[in-house]
Amino acid sequence: MKVALGIEYDGSNYFGWQRQAEVVSVQQTLEEALSKVTNTTIEVFCAGRTDSGVHGTGQVVHFDTEVERPLASWCFGTNAHLANDIAVKWAVKVAEDFHARFSATARRYRYIIFNSKLRTAILPKGVAHYHYPLDAQKMHQAGQYLLGEQDFSSFRAAKCQSHTPWRNIHHLNVVRQGNYVIVDIQANAFVHHMVRNIVGSLLEVGQGRQPIEWIKWLLEQKNRQLAAPTTKAEGLYLVNVEYPSRFGIPKTALGPLFLAD
């Protein structure tokens, strides 16, 4: 039997998603909880491997098991063995050809910026604090140069293991809600650090250091060294993963928190 789970987590206390020796990861913690529920060893496969400090409201995983449990037990039972910063949101049985990563058709991220001279005391680990004023409208306009299928070498980490820098961005929206600036981006997939590298360069436009057209120029150069530094991990959330409807993966609120879909 193959089961898919929707996972939400605060990545602040974890060294990323992927299981690693000698450090605590989200994958390891979830697998240990599921193994307690089944009394067997469980290995999970995820839709997107988030980095250290990155959060998830819409992560999807799957695992294979011969243990039968009511769907509610996969949620409540697993959550009983998890700390408060990881939670199972839903569980469904899926077809044998489903794969959390390879069946996905799109991933969606949101980057949350607290834009104020002074820091916030409310949920400070869930946002990236930038004290200089940002023009969200200019950031949005600049982001439109990145839409479509393009070579994202300028926004790709040096140690990225992907065979190709080509990705297809479906939408990139930047909006302001009070002191918060939200960058919402969806693509078929992302190269390593792509979202945080894009946001870093959009921040240069937002604070007036670079013109809107600079993003177009960066894309054309295909040179990571010309773009801005990678932004902080704590503002980034994996909020949704899209799959073909035949798999029956539930649709839930994207979040985080108050943000509308």
UniProtKB/Swiss-Prot annotation:
Keywords, in A-Z order: Isomerase, tRNA processing
Highest taxon above the source species: Bacteria
InterPro entries: PsdUridine_synth_cat_dom_sf (IPR020103), PsdUridine_synth_TruA (IPR001406), PsdUridine_synth_TruA_a/b_dom (IPR020097), PsdUridine_synth_TruA_C (IPR020095), TruA/RsuA/RluB/E/F_N (IPR020094)
Pfam families xref list: PseudoU_synth_1
GO biological process, any: tRNA pseudouridine synthesis
Enzyme Commission designation: 5.4.99.12
Intrachain disulfide bonds: none
Active site per database record: D51 (nucleophile)
Molecular function terms from GO: RNA binding; tRNA pseudouridine(38-40) synthase activity
Binding-site residues for substrate, renumbered to this chain: Y109
Gene3D superfamilies: Pseudouridine synthase I, catalytic domain, C-terminal subdomain (3.30.70.660), Pseudouridine synthase I, catalytic domain, N-terminal subdomain (3.30.70.580)
Catalytic function, reaction form: uridine(38/39/40) in tRNA = pseudouridine(38/39/40) in tRNA
Subunit structure: Homodimer.
Functional summary from the UniProt entry: Formation of pseudouridine at positions 38, 39 and 40 in the anticodon stem and loop of transfer RNAs.
Family: Belongs to the tRNA pseudouridine synthase TruA family.
NCBIfam families (UniProt xref): hisT_truA
Name under which the protein is recorded: tRNA pseudouridine synthase A
Organism this protein belongs to: Haemophilus ducreyi (strain 35000HP / ATCC 700724)
Gene label: truA
